[in-house]
Structure formats: structure tokens, C-alpha cells
């Protein structure tokens, strides 16, 4: 199959091999003309083979080029989709919720309720306050509302008030329990330590007893307790001495018998009556009626009960009847008729000049024992004014009379005092002008 003068057939295989240079030349060369088909056979075969190889190469190259854009498009599309999904994730992660306020839900609710003038809010009003105050509660997250309701209903420091008649709306008012005032520190809404509440619960009875006894809460005290009067006030049943100037004397008892810090009692064998210094720091006792006896008659005596008058040896207040209307102090426990039963008797005690403390030790001892100081802890830390208010133990006792015995202290106008032990608590009348009253723990 060899032709004379023709080239060997080996170059035909070499021409069909896809050489990059030949492929480029075939793509750039114009197509063969139709007149070249009448040429010699070897040339024709070689040209046809070359053209076929060129067409094969061109078809393969075109297919490759067509497949390349499709692959490029696919890769570009996939990359775009991946970039789009990554951008969506980044965009969603960039919209983070605002940070929660650094307070517990209890503190937030307390903050909302205390911002109200009436100190009470409905649930929707609490929501509105929190949304207006903190950006955390304005987002799409609504789980905080469940937390608010949970804390309102399960914490005992919040009280649900009954709905008032005629009030529009369906929500109940919520307020703070007054007993939970120690839950938060003053000036902030941070919780106190865990054991602080139990300590406050343990100290609460003592706190109320002290407040009610010392007169810090006027609504907790009986009507007989009187507060301290200003220095410009008229003379009355007030004691400005002792315990920081707080008035702790009930209006039915002699403040002069309390022996303020300005008084200087002399505790000798002569039993002198304590003399009170006439300085403005201590006021003096005027006519102060106390609860009357069974017959409507008050007791008489320098500290035993009844109308307590200023003694001539212990008070510079004159004993003139003209001063009766000016310095008389009425007690709510008595009526105006609970005075001396004798019409001619003066409502003020005046010690006769003949009766001196050294000449009559019995009378002066009775006066002195009644003028001894009251015990604050025994007398005025009790709520019951009639039952538990008692004259306490004196600081200096001059007699060995038992405190538990019930004595009827009788004092007539002549200054002679006598003691009648009574088992039935009856009342003795010494003369026309002497009256008495049962003194429960009478200390002499």
C-alpha cells in the first residue's frame, strides 16, 4: 500500500495527534477550498486527513470550551449561593438582643411599683414601665413576660389587691408587702444577703415593742400616752429628763415622781423628798387626774394616784387656786368629776409647815417612796395601759415591804400616811377628807 514517490503513512497518525500548536493553527486557518479536491490522491488524502483531524480537534476544542463555561457558571453559581447563605447567617447573627438589665425580676417589679405615685400597678402597667425603661424588653423576645408573672405570683413580697368596684379593666393591682421592707438595701434594688430576712423576722417583735413603748408611732400607743411638749408650752404632765429627752410618761402619772436627770434625790436616813432644780430642762407636775375608783373618787397622795399636785418642798409652782385653770392637765381616762370629793378641798397638795421631813419620818418616807424613780422597762413597754402599767421598782428601797402584796395607800390632808393590807381589794376611807385607790404593785 505504498505509492511511488509518496510519503510514508506514518505522518498520518502524527497529524491526528492533538498537538497544541497544530490545534491553534487549525483554528486560525481558513477552511480548505473546493478546488483543492481535484489534486493528487496523496495530497487529497493528506489534506482530508488533516482537515478531519482539524475538524475533530475543533469539535473537541469547542466542546471543551462549551463545557468550560458551564462548569465555570456552575462553580460561580454555587459560590454565589454559598456566599448568600453565609451573608444571611452573618446578618442574623449581627442582630443580637440587647443585654438584660443587671437586676433580678423581683427588683425590676419593685422598681416599677415604687415609681407609681399610688405604689401599686397592674400587670400591663408593669410591662409598659419595663419596656419604656430598658431596651431589652422591646425586642421580639417575649419570654420575659412569663418571668414577670411567675415572680409576681410566687414571691410573697408582692400582694395582689382586690379589684375595686367601678374600675375599668380586668387586671388586679399589685403592690409590695410592707413586711418586706428589709428585703432590699436602701438606695438600690439589689437583694440583701440570704439570712438577712430571717434576722429581721426575729427582731420584728422587739422592734414593734420598742417603737410602741417609746412613742415613735403615735397610732400604736394608747390615748393616755403623751408626747413631749415644747419648752414654750404651759406646765403639764411631761418629763424631759432621761433617755434622750423622750417623753415616756403616761398622762395619768406624775412626771415629777419619775425623778428626771436634773433632780438630785438625797438618800439618807432622814428620807428627804427629792428637790427638783428649777431649770428649763425639767418641767413640773400640775394637776393630773388618773383613773377614778369605784365611787368616782380619785386617790390622793404624792405619787400614789389621783390628783397629783406639786409639793411645796419639791416644786416652786405656787399652790394658789388661780393657777388651777392655767396648769391643769386632764387625762382622757377621767371625767371632770373625778377630782376631790370634798367641796372645800383644794386640788393641790400643800405640805403644812409643821410637818417637816425630819419631824415626821413616816410621812416623808411615804412621800419619798412614791417619788422614787419609775422603772422604764417595767412600766412603759406594755400595750395595756390599765393592766400592765405599774410603778416599777425604785432604785433605792428603804422598806422591806414585799412588792407582790396589794396595798391600799391612804393619805389624809394632815400628811399622815397609813397602809391597809387588803385581801379583797376594798377601799378604805380614813376620814371625810381622805380617799384612797388600789395601787397594784405599790412599792414603799
Curated annotation (Swiss-Prot):
Start-end of Gly residues biased regions: 76-87, 293-308
Database matches in InterPro entries: Fork_head_dom (IPR001766), Forkhead_box_regulator (IPR051770), TF_fork_head_CS_1 (IPR018122), TF_fork_head_CS_2 (IPR030456), WH-like_DNA-bd_sf (IPR036388), WH_DNA-bd_sf (IPR036390)
UniProt entry tagged with the keyword Ribosomal protein: no
Bias kind Basic residues: ranges: 263-274
Signal sequence extent: none
Segments of skewed composition (Low complexity): 34-75, 309-323
DNA-binding region extent: 99-190
Keyword Transcription regulation: yes
Domain of life: Eukaryota
GO molecular function, one term: RNA polymerase II transcription regulatory region sequence-specific DNA binding
A GO BP entry: positive regulation of DNA-templated transcription
Region feature Disordered, mapped onto this chain: 32-98, 256-323, 338-367
Intracellular or extracellular location(s): Nucleus
Keywords of this entry: Activator, DNA-binding, Nucleus, Transcription, Transcription regulation
Disulfide bonding pattern of the chain: none
GO cellular component terms attached to this protein's record: chromatin; intracellular membrane-bounded organelle; nuclear body; nucleoplasm; nucleus; transcription regulator complex
Tissue: Lung and placenta. Predominantly expressed in gastrointestinal tract including stomach.
UniProt function note: Probable transcription activator for a number of lung-specific genes. Mediates up-regulation of the E3 ligase IRF2BPL and drives ubiquitination and degradation of CTNNB1.
Domain-related comment: Two activation domains, AD1 and AD2, C-terminal of (and distinct from) the forkhead domains are necessary for transcriptional activation.
Assembly and oligomerization: Interacts with the transcription factors TBP and TFIIB.
This protein's name: Forkhead box protein F2
Biological source species: Homo sapiens
Name of the gene encoding the protein in the UniProt record: FOXF2
